[in-house]
């Protein structure tokens, strides 16, 4: 069991769901379900197993999981994931062994049937039911409750069920279309969970039968009520409308966004996509950018419908994507969006928890890193990252790790002063020069290693400043990310080369944490600066409102909308003269010309 798995096992939730074991290539080799993900997944890596399971465990290099809200959902999701991914260690379930549905036919005299094949044009379907025995019992229950046609006899010939009071196809009802439509609607209501009327009626009949000592009949009514109770279990993982949908949910925390997409095909949830990245603007804006880029990728099929959370503007998404956009308000569809949001939250929290646990597991990582790079043990590491959006409000940040732990009192922020427009190389040159000129001037302790969040270009710029301009001898490494914004490669040496670094090693986790931390720190500073600049620019030109008063307003109200909502007296309370406060309100509330 590698260190990555050890860390992730400690973070598993006590929830039902599905887990996906992966090999060294990231290929899914086994899909399973669990009532309790923590207990089930841990069991693979503890205790003895049979030969087959031992072989499976020997190939597991990583795992992921999807949280569901019930055991039934986990079971149904497992089937879909197995059919989609065909893992080599799973018993592969064929399509003809799919779960049964209950069907009301569209015939003149409708019938109730159990079927495993869904054809939307010839009836209304309910299910699927993971227990085929339960589906049969439900069908029997419906036969006893609703007098649909139950045989293939011609309409002028009565059948056995007619004499039991369970078939009205041979009575005067047979020519009454309204009767059959009403009966069909009653079943729909019943199978959709609106069964209180029937349950109440059966309860009264049960009590009445018991009062008259008809205990067998009372028991029959009791059994019917219990069968109805079984039917009340509803699934959100599969929908009988057979539509193709993508379901989006997202969660943000600590400057990071996680987006989860559930892919529903033919009414079945078959796969999900998870992506985590730092966000720069308001979360809603960056989500819109993400969803636009998502469907620009030709590998992503555009479905009939896309479900999005409530806080996203549906018209904007529809303009970007070009298909029907739905913000579910209630019921199963809303719960499916909520499930995507829940999984996004869980995934993001797991990322942070892993990083937090990594902090406590850095024993030996620093020494190993020094040995790997052939440098003295890097006790003090200083890392740099730039942040800008199309050149606006460019900033940089430095974080410091001492003995593998962040030393936040040593963190530094930099506003880029000499660079115009988006130029990461020039920005890096300025920041490195400013930082280490100060180190020389003030006699500060230089770091044992400088880490640049970037590739060959940024590292060479930093080396030129350190060695050629300042005459220092400090090792410099670069950390490159992949297209998913994850730590990917370590660059070091002269000339620069990729250093082989096991992804499950402690030194990899240390560098991963450093890169994430400097990125987070830079993004947070950039966002704060942009917000402050936006705030100040809207207040420019108002007579009597100088830098100090703007600062007072910013400190008290935090945002322009809060000032717009404030009363004049609230603004005056901040130390702003009444005439200036009135001018401010007038300026902010006047429509743009």
UniProtKB/Swiss-Prot annotation:
The lineage of its organism: Bacteria, Bacillati, Bacillota, Bacilli, Lactobacillales. The gene is uvrC. This is UvrABC system protein C. Residues 196-231 form the UVR domain. The keyword Nucleotide-binding does not apply. Residues 14-91 form the GIY-YIG domain. Belongs to the UvrC family. GO terms for molecular function: DNA binding; excinuclease ABC activity. The keyword Metal-binding does not apply. The UvrABC repair system catalyzes the recognition and processing of DNA lesions. UvrC both incises the 5' and 3' sides of the lesion. The N-terminal half is responsible for the 3' incision and the C-terminal half is responsible for the 5' incision.
